[in-house]
Design a protein with these regions (language model features):
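Conserved N-proximal alpha/beta basic substrate-recognition cap immediately N-terminal to
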Residues: 1-117
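Aromatic-residue detector
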Residues: 18, 30, 71-73, 108, ...
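Short acidic, glycine-rich loop/turn motifs
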Residues: 39, 138-140
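Phosphate-binding site of ATP-dependent enzymes
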Residues: 121-122, 129-133, 140-183
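Short, flexible, glycine/charge-rich loop motifs used to bind or transfer phosphoryl groups or to couple energy/partner
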Residues: 50-52, 105-106, 123-126, 161-162
Length: 183
């Protein structure tokens, strides 16, 4: 997207979510202008020096925020909703917030392995007992962090489940599909 926008002579600025802030009801970011892009190099972006920009004056903002879907993620979506209507936010902030990926895919549950989303430990244990082998992970996690393969006889079964539930969010438990490693 950046490559095509540069070809069309758009000015592109990038910033991280940590660098987005609201000051006196004006949305700003600590950002850098992209000067060049070379996807064949390890350091593929050439940037100007980072500086504070007022996002109210931009025509488009493209949200490309990776999970985890946490309070920082949610806050960023609320902040981006402060932009004036004259600024088009692509990947609408409220739509992103309202459609977390692991819940949204439940619209296609008929294409998924048996799945449980819960914080109720006895329901989770019953699900594990029923399917023998499962994968359990935080509902709003990312990058493979805190993903566990469990079987009903795992000596650490309860400890792992309790540890995941101690983080105050639901978990997603799915029947383990052996062929998953083949895509």
């Amino acid at each position: 997207l950046i490559e095509e926008a540069l070809k069309r002579r758009f000015s592109i600025f990038i910033y991280k979510v940590d660098d987005l802030y609201l000051e006196n009801n004006t949305l700003k970011a600590y950002a850098a202008r992209v000067l060049r892009l070379n996807v064949n190099k390890e350091k593929f972006l050439t940037l100007e020096k980072f500086s504070t920009i007022n996002l109210n004056y931009y025509d488009f903002i493209l949200i490309r925020q990776d999970p985890p879907f946490d309070m920082q993620y949610i806050t960023a979506t609320y902040l981006l909703e402060k932009l004036p209507r004259s600024c088009l936010v692509l990947n609408n902030a409220s739509s992103i917030r309202d459609c977390p990926e692991k819940l949204f895919v439940m619209e296609f549950f008929d294409l998924m392995p048996p799945t449980l989303i819960s914080r109720h430990i006895s329901s989770i244990l019953k699900f594990v007992k029923k399917f023998k082998k499962v994968v359990i992970k935080p509902l709003y996690g990312n990058g493979g962090s805190n993903v566990f393969y469990l079987n009903e006889n795992d000596p650490n079964l309860n400890i792992i489940i309790e540890n995941l539930l101690s983080k105050r969010e639901h978990v997603i438990v799915q029947k383990f599909i052996k062929k998953i490693k083949y895509g």
